[in-house]
């Protein structure tokens, strides 16, 4: 059913499948699968990113030969959108704020970036050099020494991905949703970071797993997405509870987090306990979370009405009612594939191998890179975690929807 996608919008199912009586939840489930397969990095995009990372590492080592560079964030976990930035950390024992400007100058002098795209935030809580790589047009954030926990967090996320195969598919849809509504930037709009969103999804999946509810493999992603939007958009009390993934995960009364997060941190509206550094509240800067909550609630209403409608009257994509891919992203990906397919190699590296090992000594498997249809003639390329498909279970889709309404 997904073999012949819409050529103009490859993340959508072919028009012919709509209006044929296929249950809406089945359609939405397949649309989420299709969207995930489309939006994640292709081998060409992965190689372009890998090359950009190595260029930055070469610049760093040309300045400080004894330094080391490590990768963290969404590119390390495989949860990056096509336009996501890349997060790097430089470990150097002779730290000084001047290093930020030294790196800035060297990146410009070696032709890696344009001076107009470089920003040095030396007064930020985590000082960072932000710039755009000229060749790939990929944005970078480079920090120094202070985010070893970021590498550990990325590896922890990969462990959760192995445990919850639905996690990356839900996260990618939700990340695109936040991006479209301008809620993905913490620094500029008080939105929800990629890490915070991922922890929210993990906590939700942990609670769902404890409920022992078995969902049909043909509609699982649709039900989980709708339930997530309902939970955080209409039911979760952000003022009373914090979010945790430690142990069995779930919601924790904020008052109970006071001892670990401190007198001030635990009072943020979006309170998320950092599983790597429990004294850190991941959501403390997300002052726009109430807007995010309203967006989730509105998306729930849209999707729930559609999946509850007569399936014979569904004439187009369901997911498109809350998620779209801007033409600028489509154009960028076309540009990448036209100009950089020569970067493909028989065996793609994993993200962890792109840079020197960090002081944490992390060696866990790396992120996934996937192939677009035109690159899969030799079979899909998989890096790190693979897909985990459980055997189909004989659960009635209608019963799944009925249970959703009851909850």
Swiss-Prot record:
Entry's Gene Ontology BP terms: nuclear polyadenylation-dependent ncRNA catabolic process; polyadenylation-dependent ncRNA catabolic process; RNA 3'-end processing
The entry's keywords: Magnesium, Metal-binding
Domain PAP-associated: 221-280
Phenotype upon loss of function: No visible phenotype. Flies are viable and fertile.
SUPFAM superfamilies xref list: Nucleotidyltransferase, PAP/OAS1 substrate-binding domain
Source taxon at top rank: Eukaryota
A Gene Ontology term for the protein's cellular component: nucleolus
Binding site residues for Mg(2+): 85, 87
Signal peptide boundaries: none
Pfam families, alphabetized: MTPAP-like_central, PAP_assoc
CDD domains per the UniProt record, alphabetical: NT_PAP_TUTase
Coiled-coil intervals, chain numbering: none
Biased composition (Low complexity): 357-371
Region (Disordered) residue spans: 354-390
Transcription recorded as keyword: no
InterPro entries according to UniProt: MTPAP-like_central (IPR054708), NT_sf (IPR043519), PAP_assoc (IPR002058), Trf4-like (IPR045862)
A GO term, aspect molecular function: metal ion binding
Protein family according to the UniProt entry: Belongs to the DNA polymerase type-B-like family.
Protein name (Swiss-Prot/TrEMBL): Inactive non-canonical poly(A) RNA polymerase protein Trf4-2
Naturally occurring in which organism (per UniProt): Drosophila melanogaster
Species lineage: Eukaryota, Metazoa, Ecdysozoa, Arthropoda, Hexapoda
């Amino acid at each position: 059913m997904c073999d012949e996608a819409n050529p103009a919008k490859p993340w959508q199912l072919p028009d012919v499948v709509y209006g044929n009586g296929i249950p809406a939840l089945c359609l939405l489930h397949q649309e989420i699968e299709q969207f995930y397969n489309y939006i994640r990095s292709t081998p060409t995009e992965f190689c372009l990113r890998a090359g950009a990372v190595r260029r930055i590492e070469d610049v760093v080592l040309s300045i400080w030969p004894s330094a080391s560079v490590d990768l963290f964030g969404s590119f390390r976990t495989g949860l990056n959108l096509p336009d996501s930035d890349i997060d790097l950390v430089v470990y150097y024992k002779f730290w000084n704020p001047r290093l930020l400007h030294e790196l800035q100058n060297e990146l410009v002098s070696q032709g890696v970036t344009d001076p107009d795209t470089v920003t040095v935030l030396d007064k930020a809580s985590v000082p960072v050099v932000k710039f755009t790589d000229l060749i790939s047009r990929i944005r970078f954030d480079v920090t120094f020494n202070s985010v070893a926990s970021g590498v550990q967090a990325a590896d922890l996320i990969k462990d959760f991905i192995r445990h919850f195969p639905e996690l990356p598919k839900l996260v990618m849809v939700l990340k695109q949703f936040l991006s479209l509504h301008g809620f993905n930037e913490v620094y500029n709009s008080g939105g929800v970071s990629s890490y915070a969103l991922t922890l929210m999804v993990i906590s939700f999946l942990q609670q769902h797993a404890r409920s022992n509810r078995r969902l049909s493999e043909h509609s699982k992603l649709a039900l989980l997405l709708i339930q997530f939007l309902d939970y955080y958009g209409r039911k979760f009390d952000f003022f009373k509870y914090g979010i945790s993934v430690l142990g069995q995960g779930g919601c924790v009364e904020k008052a109970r987090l006071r001892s670990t997060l401190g007198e001030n941190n635990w009072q943020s509206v979006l309170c998320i306990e950092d599983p790597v550094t429990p004294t850190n509240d991941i959501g403390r800067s997300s002052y726009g979370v109430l807007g995010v909550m309203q967006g989730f609630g509105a998306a729930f209403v849209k999707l729930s009405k559609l999946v509850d409608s007569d399936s014979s009257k569904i004439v187009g994509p369901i997911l498109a009612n809350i998620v779209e891919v801007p033409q600028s992203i489509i154009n960028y990906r076309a540009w990448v594939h036209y100009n950089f397919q020569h970067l493909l190699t028989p065996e793609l590296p994993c993200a962890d191998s792109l840079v020197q090992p960090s002081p944490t000594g992390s060696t866990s498997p790396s992120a996934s890179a996937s192939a677009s249809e035109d690159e899969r003639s030799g079979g899909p390329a998989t890096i790190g975690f693979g897909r985990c498909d459980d055997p189909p279970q004989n659960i009635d889709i209608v019963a799944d929807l009925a249970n959703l309404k009851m909850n």
